[in-house]
Amino acid sequence: MENVPYKQVIGCIRYLVSCTRPDICFSAGLLSRFMLNPGPKHWQAIKRVLQYLKHTKDLAITYSLIQSDSYHGILSGWTNPSSTLSGWSDSDWGGDVDNRKSTSGYVYTLGGGAIAWRSKKQTTVALSSTEAEYVAAALAAKEGIWIKAILEELNLFKVPTLELNCDNQSCINLARNPKMSDNIRHVSFKHHFLRDLIEDKKIELKFTPSTSMWADFLTKPVSSQKHILCCKNIGLLNFSKVKEKNMMF
């Protein structure tokens, strides 16, 4: 494996992830963990990612635009539900078989298209799926508050309360409860600022069924059907088929 350009290819893939391809975000993060000592199976996995990219080269993030006076500036006209700023936060539980750490994932959409996404392995081992989702929601909240501040500073439009979707009801109840329970006393304080954001009504955690969790493919391998569904609902569409419609890219 010494003559295989593993690191170089990973760098190219991660560049695509950071620009316009959230659909390979989880794969890029997972394969990056083996850069120090990659094996043949890791190189085969990279080639599968490259084959996928070759056959989906027409995928692009698309944003819908509808005429209206509801918003200000360049965002005037976005009135359909997908036009609001919305976020989805998800996590697996102990997906890393080596150290049993979980993977957090989030995606934010505006105008029906993704504007921010991330897949990140958690730094500590979560003792429950609720804890893993709680840590993931805190990570997503940090990004969401930053996006909200940017939009308001640019005077595009105000987001009174940011909607963050989560598919774990126990996590939502935990975030809404200001008391410190035995289940989370060991959780780092940096994650508990999520409670302050909810109490100040800056963020609202909303329950969403797992079937409608569009950040699912950022945390774990999913079926091809779910993968396509996630891509569609974050605006990652075949651009050659939509470029003639009333879309903005």
Label every model-predicted segment.
Residues I10-C12, C19-T20, H55-K57, T79-S83, ...:
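Short, well-ordered loop/turn elements at secondary-structure boundaries
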Residues N3-D23, D92-G95, T103, T130-W146:
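Conserved pre-motif C helix in the palm subdomain of viral-like polymerases
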Residues I13, T84-T130:
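RNase H-like nuclease fold core
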Residues H55-L59, A114-A116, W146, I150-E153:
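Conserved helix-loop functional segments at active or binding sites
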Residues C25, A60-T62, T109, E163-N165, ...:
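Beta-strand cores of modular interaction/reader domains in eukaryotic scaffold and signaling proteins
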Residues F34, S68-T84, S102, K120-F249:
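RNase H-like nuclease module associated with reverse transcription
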Residues A45-S86, S91:
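Conserved cytochrome P450 K-helix E-x-x-R motif and the immediately C-terminal K′/meander segment
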Residues M1-A60, S64-L65, P209, F217-T219:
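C-terminal reverse transcriptase regions that engage the nucleic-acid substrate
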